Amino acid sequence: MNLFPERNPKLAWREIDGEAVIISPEDSHVHELNETASLIWTSADGRHSVDDIAGVMAAKYNVPLPVAKADACELIETLSAKGLLLSKQREVQAGA
């Protein structure tokens, strides 16, 4: 099983200078994400797993994969707790 984070479709967002700015229409709250959180946000399309996202982070920031995965999990948990991300679990097909 692996998590496949997905952006909450109820939110409006734009990327400005490489950083995501997210607006919650329910309460007009604005969330400004840093570069790393923005990478996770833009990758969270429901098709890329946490492992996929961690791999991109490891390559981009030149850190070991376990470090990138720990950071990705922490940020995904934080964004999910704020209602910005939704996460789906599914079985990963061999060779997929």
Name each region found by the language model.
Residues 1-25:
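Long, low-complexity, charged/polar intrinsically disordered regions in eukaryotic proteins
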Residues 26-96:
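Long, charge-rich, low-complexity alpha-helical segments
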